[in-house]
Amino acid sequence: MHKKKYFSSQSLKDLNTFAIDVTAKKIIFVKTIQSLIDISKICQLSNIPYIILGEGSNVLFLENYVGVVIINRIKGIKIVEKKNFWLLHVFSGEKWHNLVKLTLNLGILGLENLALIPGCIGSAAIQNIGAYGLEFKDVCQYVDILSLKDNTIKRIYKNSCKFSYRNSIFKDQYKNEHAVIRVGIKLSKKWRPILFSSLENYITPINITAYKIFNIICKIRKKKLPDPKKIGNAGSFFKNPLIKKKKAQKLINLYKVPNYPQKNGLVKISAAWLIENYKFKHLQIGDAAIHKKQKLILINKKNATAQEIIKLAKIIHKCILKKFNILLEPEVDLIGASGKIKASKIFKLNSKLKVI
């Protein structure tokens, strides 16, 4: 018999970093794959909606959830040393930042640029997390997913994961009745520092170490970003838009907007800069507000509702589109009463405008 924790009509406030006070019919913590299989099977047979969360760091619950919220606490790390690289086999319930610290302390380098990113290993793969010039896809070797239909485990190697900016195949083809249970991370023994442009003011290439990069990034993030334990937030609410080179050049000429050319020919534009330079004056809806130091983050100052967060986001979305002709797409997952809701249903996203 697999041990599980059951709670009835429990508040989800402490289980989502936005600290939105909604409830679920049941909240169940699972520590084994078999427990996850058992619970999902019961839900399927009983026609009960269910959703799997890690740290709840990239979600916004729009209302009370009528089904079961499964909290993934499936943990375990196996490190295999090869001649030229390290291979990490990590279960999806492990916290990402804990893995970064562990590897650094063991002298296994390469994850330091992704320090202090909230969430678990599973969401790191699903969202293809990234910061300071490094993304999860750059270190991923494979992702293991569990089919909650037939209980089989399938290994998907990096090239088949369809990783892109804050996206992967796990947000699309495998988003329903599948769960990320384990990832493989490959780190070369020949460490090379990644000095992203925004780090240049804080660090010099002379005598640079992974520890220095880690400490500086942690310091920057703590200074710029709100601690979700103190101020409710889900990190960046919107994605940085990707636009065509010609359109980007016009914006650069007009506004000198921070931009980052991509390998696919598109240009990434700073969404935070767009919001900051719209110059919203004391924009706040109830307890929902824009963070003062990082404009891309929407915060719950105390007791904000999801409706207040969404209303604020809609105003920003509309204003940026009107002034810059750029469509901001939400990065957070929106959760309705029985599951995820497409952002297009709320923000009226026009797919034709995603690349302009």
From Swiss-Prot:
Functional pathway: Cell wall biogenesis; peptidoglycan biosynthesis
SUPFAM superfamilies found in the cross-reference section: FAD-binding/transporter-associated domain-like, Uridine diphospho-N-Acetylenolpyruvylglucosamine reductase, MurB, C-terminal domain
Annotated source species: Buchnera aphidicola subsp. Acyrthosiphon pisum (strain APS)
Cysteine pairings via disulfide bonds: none
One GO molecular-function entry: UDP-N-acetylmuramate dehydrogenase activity
Active site location: 166, 236 (proton donor), 331
Protein name, UniProt field: UDP-N-acetylenolpyruvoylglucosamine reductase
Family annotation (PANTHER family): UDP-N-ACETYLENOLPYRUVOYLGLUCOSAMINE REDUCTASE (PTHR21071:SF4)
Family assignment from sequence similarity: Belongs to the MurB family.
GO biological process: cell division; cell wall organization; peptidoglycan biosynthetic process; regulation of cell shape
High-level lineage: Bacteria, Pseudomonadati, Pseudomonadota, Gammaproteobacteria, Enterobacterales
Gene name as annotated: murB
A Pfam family recorded for this sequence: MurB_C
Boundaries of every FAD-binding PCMH-type domain copy: 20-190
Locations listed in the record: Cytoplasm
